């Protein structure tokens, strides 16, 4: 068993190194094609080292002592690791940036890492490029996009944070009393070659909250009876612990599945990741014959993917009209919005792509529904009332998900310092944040490459200001 586990690890590391090289090559190619030559230099070792990354690398790739030539391996590292030599690849042109490639979270920066600006620039490109081969569900812009009014101030805390070295911040928007008050975007000489006003940026788990908002519209459209409806009319999850579940329990991440799936481990039985395989595949294998355990907060993405695909199942041919109604007619998006499908399947995944202002447009639509007590607003108030306790042992002022006591309907609720205020939060990997103060008509939207910006100053402090 240990040998088998070691083989899996070696295989993973080998794939990770190959993937890292291909991603660097894609980044360098993008720099060339877009004229960012200030970040490029000719690889003087190209002719000598080309094809050294192949399995049959010849004698020309090695020194007389049998070690690989320093100029042909990454960082001159001649050691032979579990995944072999770290060949530098076949790039004729290479960037002149100080980039660190991480492999312990696949294609993502590990949560606790605090990389330099060069590394952050690479990953900003990579997070967009990583999904280029995924099938997409595309929502076209509104014919009448919402136009924001502005009454801008320069906030020293936000300005300092978005320009300082090693800050991963891409965009900051503060909307209050129907106007944009703070509007900052990363400078051109920082991450601006990758991220602009028209860049569709990845939502990560903010997309979970969008799925809930879509679910509310499906209920109000009569496709689903209520949040207490059971999912026993959907064959994809038959004979699994989710079959007899109420929708509200899956929305609340309390479906009693903690013995079978977690955010850290994926599907416990196999280690398969819930964003990489279809629900049907899980139902026929790891989840077959499973029974739910006691209800408790167990945050992970499979719950959301089940909800999303259940909505698609229930709305059928009307799904596209439902999405157009939400994003084109209500939020009135200015640019294209899309979500991606899982691998080669037709299963939707909660990963959305929007521009910075369109994130704000959707957040405003959510706030307007709540304040106007529409049918969807009543749905939002229902999931707020039906929230569950996260039972966290400690709270940290680093992101809304870690500084809220409750979770309801795919939203983070009950800010620790918020007393009785109605504040709802959306939280995505790498520091993506949308926080809506419903009582004070205030919205904060943050796009970021990674964690590490001063959340306490630019989010928490702003929420405390009346």
Predicted regions mapped to residue ranges:
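N-terminal leader/targeting segments and the immediately adjacent pre-domain N-terminus
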Residues: 20-193, 224, 252, 462-466
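Classical Sec-dependent N-terminal signal peptides that target proteins to the secretory pathway
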Residues: 1-21
């Amino acid at each position: 068993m240990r040998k088998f586990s070691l083989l899996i690890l070696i295989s993973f590391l080998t794939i990770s190194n190959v993937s890292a090289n291909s991603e660097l090559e894609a980044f360098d190619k993008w720099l060339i094609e877009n004229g960012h030559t200030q970040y490029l230099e000719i690889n003087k070792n190209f002719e000598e080292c080309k094809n050294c990354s192949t399995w049959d690398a010849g004698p020309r790739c090695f020194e007389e002592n049998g070690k690989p030539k320093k100029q042909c391996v990454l960082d001159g590292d001649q050691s032979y690791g579990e995944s072999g030599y770290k060949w530098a690849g076949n790039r004729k042109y290479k960037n002149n940036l100080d980039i660190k490639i991480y492999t312990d979270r696949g294609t993502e920066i590990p949560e606790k890492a605090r990389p330099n600006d060069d590394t952050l620039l690479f990953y900003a490109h990579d997070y967009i490029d990583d999904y280029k081969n995924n099938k997409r569900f595309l929502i076209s812009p509104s014919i009448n996009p919402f136009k924001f009014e502005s009454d801008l101030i320069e906030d020293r805390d936000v300005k300092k944070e978005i320009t300082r070295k090693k800050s991963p911040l891409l965009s900051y928007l503060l909307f209050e009393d129907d106007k944009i008050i703070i509007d900052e975007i990363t400078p051109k000489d920082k991450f601006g070659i990758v991220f602009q006003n028209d860049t569709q940026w990845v939502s990560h788990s903010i997309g979970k909250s969008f799925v809930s908002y879509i679910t509310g519209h499906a209920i109000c459209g009569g496709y689903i009876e209520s949040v207490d409806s059971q999912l026993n009319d959907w064959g994809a999850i038959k004979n699994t612990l989710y079959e007899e579940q109420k929708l509200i329990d899956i929305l609340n991440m309390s479906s009693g599945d903690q013995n079978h799936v977690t955010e850290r481990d994926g599907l416990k039985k196999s280690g398969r990741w819930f964003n990489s395989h279809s629900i049907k595949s899980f139902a026929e294998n790891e989840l077959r014959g499973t029974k739910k355990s006691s209800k408790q907060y167990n945050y992970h993405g499979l719950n959301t993917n089940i909800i999303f695909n259940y909505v698609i199942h229930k709305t059928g041919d009307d799904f596209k009209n439902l999405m157009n109604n939400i994003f084109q007619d209500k939020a009135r998006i200015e640019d294209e919005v899309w979500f991606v499908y899982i691998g080669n399947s037709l299963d939707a995944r909660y990963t959305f792509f929007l521009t910075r202002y369109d994130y704000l447009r959707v957040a405003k639509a959510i706030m307007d529904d709540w304040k106007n007590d529409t049918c969807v607003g009543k749905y939002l108030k229902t999931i707020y009332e039906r929230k569950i306790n996260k039972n966290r042992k400690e709270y940290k002022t680093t992101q809304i998900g870690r500084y809220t006591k409750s979770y309801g309907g795919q939203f983070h609720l009950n800010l620790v310092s918020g007393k009785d205020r109605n504040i709802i939060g959306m939280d995505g990997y790498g520091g993506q944040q949308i926080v809506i103060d419903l009582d004070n008509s205030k919205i904060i939207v943050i796009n970021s490459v990674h964690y590490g910006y001063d959340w306490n100053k630019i989010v928490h402090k702003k929420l405390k200001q009346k």
